[in-house]
Amino acid sequence: MAADMQRKRSSECPDGTLTPSDGHSVERAESPTPGLAQGMEPGAGQEGAMFVHARSYEDLTESEDGAASGDSPKEGARGPPPLPADMRQISQDFSELSTQLTGVARDLQEEMLPGSSEDWLDPPGAVGRPATEPPREGTAEGDEEDATEAWRLHQKHVFVLSEAGKPVYSRYGSEEALSSTMGVMVALVSFLEADKNAIRSIHADGYKVVFVRRSPLVLVAVARTRQSAQELAQELLYIYYQILSLLTGAQLSHIFQQKQNYDLRRLLSGSERITDNLLQLMARDPSFLMGAARCLPLAAAVRDTVSASLQQARARSLVFSILLARNQLVALVRRKDQFLHPIDLHLLFNLISSSSSFREGEAWTPVCLPKFNAAGFFHAHISYLEPDTDLCLLFVSTDREDFFAVSDCRRRFQERLRKRGAHLALREALRTPYYSVAQVGIPDLRHFLYKSKSSGLFTSPEIEAPYTSEEEQERLLGLYQYLHSRAHNASRPLKTIYYTGPNENLLAWVTGAFELYMCYSPLGTKASAVSAIHKLMRWIRKEEDRLFILTPLTY
């Protein structure tokens, strides 16, 4: 398997300065611990690798054409060709699109009227979904207005359409009701490409509109969030890879070569819950932001026993054996010289968490790992060790006829766990799947994210008060996204950032070896935050064999 090649990014350039657009204070700072040598950071002691070697966010988000989608142009690089004289027409078209996004009620009502074109009718089991409940008798008009108002209030919308303009997926509302909006989007893309230009993002009226084209699909995000265009593009790539995981790239290309206006919803019928779940995970799980996997906190001896049991319970067709719990990695064993990409692992996590049916027995399902091989299917054996636990066992096989051999691997794995006493230790670990930030012993520290780039793993404590509600948790992740986008700005990256807000202060520190994001009380000072870094890094180092997989095994 070809691994992603590491590139020397513009992050080696001197730090730039960015002016806050939200009224909060953001400062650059010198390296908090200049004496920390690369290779000595927590997590760097991993013996061997589990994932595709990618040490930077840019490596993980690099697209197949060699450029990170949504990147801003590098300083000193030649700019894009002059825009066509018809740019006024493009602006006018976007104004119409913006009008639809902020005043979509009329369009939705017209599209939902009887007598709409049959080209946009749902096939059996289509993925279209109403934005809200159906209107009640006697109040249809008022309820339709409420539904469209609720649609407009969402902070982020995601649309997928074919290059021919056929709707494939929309995060909210039905695809038919939004067909005119999607038509404007594909018209903008096609208009610019006719002049050998490519549209990547538009910023207007408080919105970011980000386009990612992966022929034969066009993916669009419309957001009013703190995320950068680059991060929104990465989320769209996840959606694209999610579609590939269900169809394979070869099948997708073949379909549209045969019929350019094919309605892809016929093949994706019923899969919208998987895509919905992926978007929900990206809104609250920092794994996607960090481009890494989080491990279940576990004693090193227990984890080594689990890994050895997975290694010994193998079949000739197996490529990966994975034990996970609540989207946290417990153990991963891979075939020698075969490496999993974090994006593929996230897609597997999403597949499992999107359906409760996997708890009912042993499942055998085809799955494409698009970053490993987008051309074909593997077959995944998915089962929970016990119905009442969150321990899920995943075997990835190359042989679709090997179900019974792989099922026997599951039986042998469970036997070894019980004989070695690891089964009870795992159940005990699941009682506290997250550790408390209070264990670090830093009074003002509320939360943190720490990623070891060499291992592809990150760690973070449980999100606790004052971030107890779902809204507050998403707001905290939004702050991390804000710092992350500034640290990874393609034209002027920042290595250290200090952020002060009304409810919390944050500090970001990004190096070639690790990334650290800290959230602490607004009463804390910058000096105390820098001082806390030393203590936090020492604590993570002391606990690294519990928080990271340091001895990964192979077949």
From Swiss-Prot:
Keywords: Guanine-nucleotide releasing factor, Phosphoprotein. GO terms for cellular component: Mon1-Ccz1 complex. It comes from the Eukaryota. It holds the Pfam family Fuz_longin_2. The keyword Kinase does not apply. The keyword Phosphoprotein applies. Residues 1-12 have a biased composition (Basic and acidic residues). Belongs to the MON1/SAND family. This is Vacuolar fusion protein MON1 homolog A. It comes from Macaca fascicularis (Crab-eating macaque). The lineage of its organism: Eukaryota, Metazoa, Chordata, Craniata, Vertebrata.
